[in-house]
């Protein structure tokens, strides 16, 4: 029913992949051989180990904190100089940009990356280069919001529209084409075919083989970069670097140093934010008054960390965690606690924001609304002081919409009514809680707080509703109930089976998977220029969709273990 809340719910194989003129450095992504004792590998391990030691052990720092910061800035400046030096031949920066983004350190190089990709986009369609280069160019441009037409891949197709034999054993190129295909939008038949062909062909090439290269390919197929939250892609990427056995360019070593220091800083930042979140939740006191409701501040702040990933947005993440926590609590009130009559009154109170109407409600509902009012007022005052605009009305309306959607589902369950799939999804997109959370995120980012933009966000635009559809349907693919929930309600799968008599569960689940794929295509399209929203907000919408699969990785007890959540930080 609610956001973030579940209801019912060997080497020989690849030897032909590298043309003689292929770049030899690592991340082209897969080496021809893996030698964990190679000099290059030993050097890379040493870089990572020494940087970590210098940061984590004060007695082994270069001299003092200033020295470490100086070296960090020196490495950043070195990379910026390389990117700027290639300004007349921007395509030479593509591999470096891919590495920077894969390591999650693009915050330091935003201007240089934007300038490079903009220049490449202005050059128009480029059909020259091998498959890997073409697909990489396509992916990087689309990630930045540039609409590159799929016709760029015409040279790899034969006259019948199939893929030419020359690319069928190009593992490096096929892998990059697979990654690029995940940014396709509706109506792109060439990329639909590329996704199906590369997935099948790469599995075929890897069949019966055991190697690190195979493992990395299989990880890419299971977790394509575009649909995977950044923290996991950077960890996977660093792991690849550590065991790659090739001579890599000097700039890669500089990037590794930057990434390692950033990683250590981020861990410290995260620990501080989590400490503040736990303190806030304890002082709020809801855990005592709404005893059966979930108390999971670690999980709630994990969502905020993944949605707003810029390290400079600590205050915004802490504030976003607060409404996320209330989504969970109110969801449990509707699912577990409340009688239908009480839920109807509670919804009316939220809709009118009427404190007087609380008198007839039980204490846990009164306390919950008071917490909701306090959080909404706190956020509104902060935004008004910072930006001169009062978001109170918009925030209250989002809570009213959520509660009304919860109430609809409560009535369905109470009466035994199983809605049509269309009815279910129309309401489910709202009851997912994604719209409410993304409205808060938009306001907290403080970008373009104009009447027109806020009204657009309030209307649950495609960039938000697509992400909500992904969450709702992912939720319903799960067969387990969320932890600590005694209540139940219908799922899309149940509605489908009821509406399409004779269908099997497998057929229903296949249908759901197809709808998720279409929702991703719509979300991809919404994030391309011209987009009415900032890149930071577009990325936040992508991030919430990327985070969904992670938050449904339950253990045997249908819980998200704390250690698992900590590993995501």
Curated annotation (Swiss-Prot):
TM helices/strands, residue ranges: none
Chain location of the short sequence motif DDXXD motif per the record: 331-335
InterPro entries membership: Isoprenoid_synthase_dom_sf, Terpene_cyclase-like_1_C, Terpene_synth_N, Terpene_synth_N_sf, Terpene_synthase-like, Terpene_synthase_metal-bd, Terpenoid_cyclase/PrenylTrfase
GO biological process: monoterpene biosynthetic process; terpenoid biosynthetic process
Residues binding Mg(2+) 3, per UniProt: 475, 479, 483
Keyword line: Chloroplast, Lyase, Magnesium, Manganese, Metal-binding, Plastid, Transit peptide
Pfam families: Terpene_synth, Terpene_synth_C
UniProt enzyme class: lyase
Gene Ontology cellular-component terms listed: chloroplast
Binding positions for (2E)-geranyl diphosphate per the UniProt entry: 294, 331, 335, 472, 475
Catalytic activity from the UniProt record: (2E)-geranyl diphosphate + H2O = (S)-linalool + diphosphate
Binding, Mg(2+) 1: 331, 335
Gene3D superfamilies, alphabetized: Farnesyl Diphosphate Synthase, Terpene synthase, N-terminal domain
Function according to Swiss-Prot or TrEMBL: Involved in monoterpene (C10) biosynthesis. The major product is (S)-linalool.
The protein's name in its UniProt record: S-(+)-linalool synthase, chloroplastic
Annotated organism of origin: Arabidopsis thaliana
